[in-house]
Amino acid sequence: MAESTFGRQAVNDGKLCARLRNGKDVTLDTAERIRSFIRSNQVQSSLAASPTELGEAATKGTTTMSGKTSKAKKTTSRKPAKEAASSAGDRPFRFYDNRQKYLAFVNTTNEKRKVAERAAKELMLLKPTPPALRLFDAGMGDGTVLTHLMRAMHRRFPIMPFFIVGKEISLEDVRLSLEKLPDRFMEHPASVIVITNLYYAEAPWLRPASVKSAAALNWREVALEGDSAYEYGEQLAALDPFLVDGWQVKSSEKTGNPMYVRPSVLVIYRKDHSFLLDSVIPKPGQVGGGYDLAIASQPWRARMSAEFKVGKVLAPIVRALGAAGRLLAVQSCGQDPAQELVNKVWPDEEPFKVNRHELIKVLRAELGRDARNFNFVTGSDSKAIFRYEMHTLPSEVQQSIGTSTLFAAWNASIYVNQIEDERLESVLSSNEYLQHTAQVLKKHKGLWFNDESFVVSRKQ
């Protein structure tokens, strides 16, 4: 036995320190056992230590540990199925937990493409600096917006390295996103793409806020081999066991929002470009933000307060912008046929009470004196508001409208207006809601929606 990082009689802790630092093969259970051991030894040592010694230890931030250690059994962070099921049953239901509604909405409307087109307009205003153009996607979803934007980025910056961070809590959406990436690595090989389940206040820096979560950080690097999109796709598909373990979620008892069980970071790049990307590939604890562009498309519930949206989402992302960096935020704003349909069923429904002007006002207050370092552009309605539509044929909305079209229009309307399932039970007992849907479709010759956008940019 020798003196080591954890004190005398600590066994094999050199390897453990490396694992903690790299976020590799350290479960939450292991991290908690270490913390418990430290706490118990702190209590024991404080009984024998003098006030002077305690003061010095607190000042230096050191801890002395002693005692025998035993071999640790391999543990896993996975929760029993019964426990997960019980917690899921007790939590509040959230409208965007329903995968069926989400996928139906995504595949029957062109919102994703419209958001990507709006984001692409920001590219001409960027002023990236070496070693890479840095992009943060605050809510990657199924990767549709990101991959559309990457095509536009390649067109404008064909040889510039890309560093892209996508924040996504949903395992299903991460899988869908990975399916879209092989072609992106073929077209733009100088890309480093990072996917994480960290919170908005943590994701830009790829660093958990709490010590406990940081100790259990699940960091995985994947260097893709080969020279074809097929080979890259096969290697990304093989990551599924890692995703299943790293993207487990639990529900907040207060809000019902999903929270990660274990913080995870997945770093992907092409092995044959690792030399070129050496200064771009992130290392644990060494990511400093500095993003050239950040996209926040529909990252919150419409009914949440402006203070919540700013404090939990907007302010952390704005602070992560680099010099001349830009944040594009997009949210639904209503005043469209979809809201008209919802108001036919629920006349007093007002889901979009917080507009872009209110968000900017609260954001200025949240930033305080730092607000003078940013430009806030809400724009006029003609520039800030853009429209997207549900896919329909002209013949489908002229005379007799098919049932599938009615259901698709109804689903898209209640999804955008964020109507919870429990409120739908009484409405779905009759066909009156389908009659209202048909009336709105015929009146407007289709179904369309309004989104509004605003930009916050850091001054140079």
Predicted features along the sequence, with ranges:
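Short, basic-rich loop-to-helix N-cap that marks the start of a DNA-contacting helix
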Residues: 17-35, 396
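N-terminal, positively charged/glycine-rich alpha-helical extensions of SAM-dependent methyltransferases
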Residues: 65-101, 229-246
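Class I S-adenosyl-L-methionine-dependent methyltransferase module
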Residues: 90, 144, 148-289, 412, ...
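Conserved class I S-adenosyl-L-methionine
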Residues: 130-143, 164-165
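Conserved beta-strand signature within the Rossmann-like core of class I S-adenosyl-L-methionine
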Residues: 324-332
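Substrate-binding/catalytic lobe of Class I Rossmann-like enzymes that use SAM or dcSAM, i.e.
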Residues: 333-441
